[in-house]
Curated annotation (Swiss-Prot):
Keywords, ordered alphabetically: Disulfide bond, Electron transport, Heme, Iron, Metal-binding, Signal, Transport
Any one GO molecular-function label of the UniProt entry: heme binding
Matches recorded under PROSITE patterns: CYTC
Protein name, UniProt field: Cytochrome c''
């Protein structure tokens, strides 16, 4: 099956840095890809490009304000972010930079539910989640 080949290649590309957080992130990409493919057989593999677009896209929040993931996490998810409401510092999202990201798979799902509902007004789709995490896996260097 083409999807398994694509996922296998994706896994090999990232296996050189197989830390627990990266491994969990890869597992989540695989999980969400399978769910997305089950719902839509045309969805074959995560798109890093779509993940980056999603990360930077501004949405009108349920409160009427515009926000994007990058609003708090900066344009580069390898950077330290800052909550736009509280001003609190946010550790980098990129699992290759922040080894604590994606260590708790249940927490990841809770955070997706919370943030997707806060920003989009609905849960993110499995394909959006797969694309998003695939993009985060590519960000390895904070900008200065």
């Amino acid at each position: 099956m083409k999807i398994k080949t694509i996922i296998a290649v994706f896994g090999v590309l990232f296996s050189a840095h197989a830390l627990a957080d990266v491994t969990n992130a890869e597992k989540l990409v695989y999980k969400y890809t399978n769910i997305a493919h089950s719902a839509n057989p045309m969805y074959e593999a995560p798109s890093i490009t779509d993940g980056k677009i999603f990360f930077n896209r501004k949405f009108k929040t349920p409160s009427g304000k515009e926000a994007a993931c990058a609003s708090c996490h900066t344009n580069n998810p390898a950077n330290v972010g800052k909550n736009i409401v509280t001003g609190k510092e946010i550790p980098p999202l990129a699992p290759r930079v922040n080894t604590k990201r994606f260590t708790d798979i249940d927490k990841v799902e809770d955070e997706f539910t919370k943030h997707c509902n806060d920003i989009l007004g609905a849960d993110c789709s499995p394909s959006e989640k797969a694309n998003f995490i695939a993009y985060l896996l590519t960000e390895t260097k904070p900008t200065k």
